[in-house]
């Protein structure tokens, strides 16, 4: 009776070496995506991923699992379109079930101004081959019969955009899928190893200091969403980032009612239903700087009120738990990818609300940059230098909530 069942597969436990070709600080989905791409596509396997806690303990384990490409600038749409393309076959590449499913995204508009923004976004998306449709209220009703077109009697729905490629992927599965795939190829994934400093010699980053001792490196990559400014400061790099909190909650399991994601562009709230039946509710990033992951009753009350304005059936559901993650928000609501200005120190930072969606393409393009020394065209607009050169990629309208 051998060979009938798959053996349980865990990460290989390796001793922390004194040096690596590449040290990636941060065991979230972006750091692990980079490690996998370095090993799988460039043969760079002398790589260490260091996480102060456990892999996926930060934003990767706290996001709401949304994957989409309906962004709003000529730079971001191709980037997330490429990422979505990788998502579709990523499970096969990693040999891991990511619970990926394409269900669509419905973004409701309660004002003509927001509807005009969605019309413009639809035109831009279509120009880059991304399907985003504009719907009338009657078409909204057909797309989701549970939507209250009166907006709770306060904000009637005047239209919507619908993004059929909108998808979901189980975040824990993605983290472990990347980690196990990288580990199989020789990457060392170290949990519980906190980085306490960056070693700089003659203006070049040459390694890190950890609680377990110094580790030399040919290149160090920061992939610590939520704490990017702290780590970068250790290398003498100042990042234009504010760290803010983003909360969400789920209800007790409810009968299957929702397919895809339903959001309101004016109420700043979104709802989806998980595979377990929970109704998942999120809202906008809190508008102040914090490193606290403490959840608040104020968010629970306000997000519940807003969700009932668009989906009144949720009054029958009971909130079960809530949580908070940290978002590194840049001035233009776009990521920072590439060199830091310090030789040997690279950045995967400013991941805001979009880090999970972009992780496959962020890892692929950053691996290419590290392996070849050439910046892929897709991420050229997202260099740190854009803030100094006044070449920002403003996309706040697409990235405020989910």
Q: Across the structure, where does each feature detected by a protein language model lie?
A:
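Extreme N-terminal leader/targeting segments of oxidoreductases
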Residues: 1-22, 37-45, 399
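Glycine-rich FAD pyrophosphate-binding loop
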Residues: 39-60
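Active-site lid/adjacent beta-loop-alpha segment flanking the redox-cofactor pocket in flavoenzymes
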Residues: 238, 253-349
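Helical element adjacent to the flavin cofactor pocket in flavoenzyme catalytic cores
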Residues: 161-218
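Dinucleotide-binding Rossmann-like beta1-alpha1 core, especially the glycine-rich loop
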Residues: 64-146, 268, 306-308
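C-terminal catalytic lobe of FAD-dependent flavoproteins
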Residues: 308-402
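Central helical "cap/lid" subdomain
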Residues: 210-259
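Helix-loop-beta segment of a Rossmann-like dinucleotide-binding subdomain
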Residues: 17, 98-107, 121, 128, ...
């Amino acid at each position: 009776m051998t060979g009938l069942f798959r053996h349980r597969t865990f990460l290989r436990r390796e001793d922390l070496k004194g040096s690596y070709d590449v040290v990636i600080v941060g065991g979230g989905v972006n750091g692990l995506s980079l490690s996998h791409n370095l090993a799988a596509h460039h043969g760079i396997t002398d790589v260490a991923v260091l996480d102060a806690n456990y892999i996926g303990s930060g934003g990767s384990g706290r996001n709401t699992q949304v994957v989409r490409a309906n962004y709003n600038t000529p730079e971001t749409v191709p980037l997330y379109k490429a990422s979505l393309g990788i998502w579709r076959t990523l499970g096969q590449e990693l040999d891991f079930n990511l619970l990926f499913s394409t269900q669509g995204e419905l973004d409701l508009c309660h004002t003509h101004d927001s509807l005009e923004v969605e019309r413009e976004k639809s035109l831009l998306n279509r120009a880059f081959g991304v399907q985003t449709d504009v719907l009338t209220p009657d078409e909204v009703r057909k797309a989701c019969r549970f939507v209250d077109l009166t907006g709770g009697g306060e904000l009637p729905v005047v239209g919507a955009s619908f993004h059929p490629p909108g998808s979901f992927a189980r975040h824990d599965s993605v983290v472990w899928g990347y980690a196990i795939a990288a580990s199989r190829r020789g990457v060392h994934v170290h949990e519980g190893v906190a980085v306490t400093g960056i070693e700089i010699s003659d203006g070049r980053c040459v390694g890190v200091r950890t609680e377990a001792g110094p580790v030399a490196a040919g290149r160090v990559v920061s992939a610590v969403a939520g704490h990017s400014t702290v780590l970068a400061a250790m290398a003498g790099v100042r990042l234009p980032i504010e760290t803010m909190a983003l909360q969400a909650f789920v209800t007790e399991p409810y009968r299957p009612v929702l397919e895809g994601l339903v959001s309101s562009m004016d109420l700043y709230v979104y709802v989806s239903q998980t595979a377990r039946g929970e109704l998942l509710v999120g809202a906008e990033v809190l508008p102040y700087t914090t490193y606290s992951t403490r959840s608040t009753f104020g968010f629970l009350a306000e997000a519940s009120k807003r969700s009932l304005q668009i989906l009144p059936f949720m009054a029958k559901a009971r909130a079960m738990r809530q949580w908070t993650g940290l978002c590194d928000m840049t001035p233009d609501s776009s990521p920072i990818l590439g060199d830091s200005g310090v030789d040997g120190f690279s950045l995967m930072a400013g991941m805001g609300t979009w880090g999970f969606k972009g992780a496959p393409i962020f890892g692929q393009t950053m691996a290419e940059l590290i392996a070849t020394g050439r910046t892929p065209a897709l991420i050229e607009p997202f260099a740190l230098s854009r803030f100094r050169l006044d070449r920002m990629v403003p996309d706040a309208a697409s990235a405020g909530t989910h």
